[in-house]
Amino acid sequence: MIKLDMTILDSLKENKALRKLLFSGHFGLEKENIRVTSDGKLALTPHPAIFGPKEDNPYIKTDFSESQIEMITPVTDSIDDVYNWLENLHNIVSLRSKNELLWPSSNPPILPAEKDIPIAEYKTPDSPDRKYREHLAQGYGKKIQLLSGIHYNFSFPEALIDGLYDEISLPNESKRDFKNRLYLKVAKYFMKNRWLLIYLTGASPVYLADFTKTKQEEKLRDGSSALHDGISLRNSNAGYKNKESLYVDYNSFDAYISSISNYIEAGKIESMREFYNPIRLKNAHTDQTVESLAKHGVEYLEIRSIDLNPLEPNGISKEALHFIHLFLIKGLLSEDRELCENNQQLADENENNIALNGLSKPAIKNCDNEEMALADAGLLELDKMNDFIQSLRPEDTYFQAIIEKQKERLLHPEKTIAAQVKEQSATAGFIEFHLNQAKTYMEETEALAYKLIGAEDMELSTQIIWKDAIARGIKVDVLDRAENFLRFQKGDHVEYVKQASKTSKDNYVSVLMMENKVVTKLVLAENNIRVPFGDSFSDQALALEAFSLFKDKQIVVKPKSTNYGWGISIFKNKFTTEDYQEALNIAFSYDSSVIIEEFIPGDEFRFLVINDKVEAVLKRVPANVTGDGIHTVRELVEEKNMDPLRGTDHLKPLEKIRTGPEETLMLSMQKLSWDSIPKANETIYLRENSNVSTGGDSIDYTAEMDDYFKEIAIRATQVLDAKICGVDIIVPRETIDRDKHAIIELNFNPAMHMHCFPYQGEQKKIGDKILDFLFE
């Protein structure tokens, strides 16, 4: 077995900066899932149109089949970030694949006849990507192409390579040659020891009987087949391999390039893309030819042998990602040993033996053809990992715990992923087990559909439009996280967006007018659009003196320039001087000027207008609780606020009901307190204004709303030259009174999340509508 390279280890021990860099890197993932129907059959629908042409979307493509979706993360600087990206892509694809599920196994679901398996479609029939897939279908068959998995792309930090180059490079060795040699060394280690990775991550021991046959299989009660003691059909000789073994020369980078070129010239493979090695040396240039690799050198490694783990929602655990990273670090820190053709054959035998018989703990052969017990061989490698962790990062208990878990799996095969998958498939059936997993994961995705993992600290509307941009393959940069300021880029087209709806389409003066409610009302009224009459005050004493003008009227007291319904008090019934003064105190706490205006009876609706079209209408019900005759108002609020969809600061679709001065005032107007116990089924309103932002409930009314009011909303936005605008209209309950409506506010930064995830009714794709407006 391969020893640790003490030259590198000693250099790292003496250099704290290099030690830190060793455990970092650049990470990217590619994941394939087959789209299936609710009964586990290959979905024959086209690739979802929302993702756009496959050539143009860097994140969401297809692999071989039109039904085989591929998710590609960008390169990140941490495993946490790449895992979040994978989870977000998985969620986006799941939610956009209507009435379909993502099949969680590497082994295919129920397939149609070979001729009916659709090859991925591209912009033109003669696309190189289409031609390549037709070549594969002819050479290997379509069914075998549907084996799916995860590709793990990794590179060491350039600063680490630079530091090691200064410390341990050979005389007269260029930086490029050193880097190529380093990655080649890691690849050799991987090829020799990949059996261990397959044992620990393999997850495809069960498959449908009509997919393939193996000598080691047993029949399960549902008629599916399982490898008797196997780990991974996909990584076995029955999986997806080149037609014949291709042994490349690992003695030098130039020899590696030459041997692949020779296979291409001999017609063994069409191009480097068809070199189905478990690990490939790659660079970031998109043509991915052997000539490009020779010219630019190695920039990263691509590991291709990772099965989809059906026990994980995203197909792989964060723990597995960390272990693979440690595995590659082990390759860097190991002695550079020859990987001749004979050694490659032994490595292939070990891989196939583990893939087909791993649960029976077969012996592992070393390069001298000597056998070692599986557990002993595996523990030897894991102990060396522990050694360099203890030596270079002794404080890291997380990595040590990961190694200990892998040891448990080595000593107890029943704890492997493969054993668990086989057991559960045997109990429920191959199709039923994987369908249940897929449905469970879909339910979990739907429950958090509003969320962008890793951006939970940002406004919900920002998360939504960011997710919708990813779906379209639009590049997103965060310019100012606290301000929710993003940059979207599609090709050469760049858009800057703040808080999801402040865009380049905004007119600055329009924003200023909408920000000032007095100006808004004045301009609308001058254009014969009905608004409530009233007055504004900058002096609280003068506002208080005006009590006699308003005391017998239904009125609204609100700040002049606030948003989200904050600081608003509504009096529909008789009110006292004290009530009036408290309302002024609240309003002046939000602004230096307040408006006192008539209360318009009716229901409040939010009309979302984008580019002169009403895209959504929402009825907003004021914050309320329903009594049960047992609990107090305060207790009922606490219970309603436990809804997982309720949060604060617009981070969830609904806002928690507050227990502040506005709510206390509203209760007092009903002769109630927080300790009052409402009757069963009695609705108690805690707010007069119906903003969702203050704990109200949202109900979609887009289809039901009269076009008469939609036209009024559009006209109001046209008057102020507003392109993305929330128009709040009080609509009378009786049709005969519709002329008694009034616009009470125009919002230049309307929240979209309440339309996307209403309390009741149809969810609207507002992020898509804004992106359409910006980019099309």
From Swiss-Prot:
Entry annotated with the keyword Ribosomal protein: no
Entry-linked SUPFAM superfamilies: Glutamine synthetase/guanido kinase, Glutathione synthetase ATP-binding domain-like
Binding site for Mg(2+) 1: D728, E745
Entry note: cofactor: Binds 2 magnesium or manganese ions per subunit.
Listed PROSITE patterns: ATP_GRASP
Reaction(s) catalysed (UniProt annotation): L-cysteine + L-glutamate + ATP = gamma-L-glutamyl-L-cysteine + ADP + phosphate + H(+); gamma-L-glutamyl-L-cysteine + glycine + ATP = glutathione + ADP + phosphate + H(+)
Pathway info: Sulfur metabolism; glutathione biosynthesis; glutathione from L-cysteine and L-glutamate: step 1/2; Sulfur metabolism; glutathione biosynthesis; glutathione from L-cysteine and L-glutamate: step 2/2
Protein keywords: ATP-binding, Glutathione biosynthesis, Ligase, Magnesium, Manganese, Metal-binding, Multifunctional enzyme, Nucleotide-binding
Binding residues for ATP: 548-606
EC number: 6.3.2.2, 6.3.2.3
GO CC, one annotated term: cytosol
Annotated segments matching region Glutamate--cysteine ligase: 1-354
Cofactor: Mg(2+); Mn(2+)
Binding, Mg(2+) 2: E745, N747
Residues annotated to bind Mn(2+) 2: E745, N747
Binding site for Mn(2+) 1: D728, E745
GO molecular function: ATP binding; glutamate-cysteine ligase activity; glutathione synthase activity; metal ion binding
Domain of life: Bacteria
InterPro entries, alphabetized: ATP-grasp, ATP_grasp_subdomain_1, Gln_synth/guanido_kin_cat_dom, Glu_cys_ligase, Glut_biosynth, Glut_cys_ligase, GshAB_ATP-grasp, PRibGlycinamid_synth_ATP-grasp
Homology family: In the N-terminal section; belongs to the glutamate--cysteine ligase type 1 family. Type 2 subfamily.
Assembly behavior: Monomer.
Physiological role: Synthesizes glutathione from L-glutamate and L-cysteine via gamma-L-glutamyl-L-cysteine.
Name the UniProt record assigns to this protein: Glutathione biosynthesis bifunctional protein GshAB
Annotated organism of origin: Listeria welshimeri serovar 6b (strain ATCC 35897 / DSM 20650 / CCUG 15529 / CIP 8149 / NCTC 11857 / SLCC 5334 / V8)
